[in-house]
Amino acid sequence: PVVTRVQFNSHHDYGWQDGPMIPNKGLQLYASAGVYGRLYKGLVEFQFAPEVVYAQNQDLPAPGVRMYQGDFPDRFGTETYQRSSSGQSYIKLNVDFLSVGFSSANVAWGPGRYSSVIMSENAPGMQHFTVESNKPLKTKWGTLEGQFLTGKMMHSGFRYAVGPTGDGSSLEPVY
C-alpha cells in the first residue's frame, strides 16, 4: 500500500495521532510505501513499510509552561526536519493462535477519547520483540487475547521547555 499525508499549520505547532509526523508550524509531508506477504501457508508473515517525513519546522513564539511534562519539544531543532525509518514493518512467525516476531510498527492498546489508553500512534513506532495472540483463544470463561512486548523507547534528542533529557527507557508491558 502507498500512503501520503500533507499537513499545513499556519500559526502554531499542532499535531496529534500523526505517527512520525511532528507538531510543526508550516508544511509537512509524510509518505510510506510497502509490501505485505505470507509464506509457507501463513507460517511466516511480513510487512515492509518504511516511512519518510519532511517538515518545514518554522520558528515559533516561546512557549509558556505546560501542565504535562514529557518529551514534547516545541520545535524539533532549528532547521528543516527530515526523518526516515523502517516505519510500520514487521516479521512474525504464526503458530496456531500465537505470533512471535520483531516489529517497528506502532502499537495501540485500548480505547480512548483522543488516543488509546496505554499505547498510541502519537509518535513513531519503536523497535520491539512481541509475542501475541493472532486470534481469540476460546476458554470456558470466554475468549482471551493478549500481547507481550519488549523494546526501548528513545528520547527525541531535542530540547523542550520543561523536563529533563534522557537516553531512553526500557518498556516491558503486558496487556
Question: Whereabouts are the PLM-identified features?
Answer:
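Outer-membrane beta-barrel translocator domains and adjoining extracellular loop/strand segments
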Residues: 59-63, 112-118, 156-165
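Carboxylate/His-rich catalytic cores and anion/metal-binding grooves
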Residues: 34-78, 83
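Outer-membrane beta-barrel domain signature
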Residues: 19-24, 75-79, 117-120
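Signature for the C-terminal beta-barrel architecture of outer-membrane proteins
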Residues: 108, 126-175
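Residues on the lipid-exposed face of transmembrane beta-strands in outer-membrane beta-barrel proteins
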Residues: 33-37, 89-95, 102, 129-135
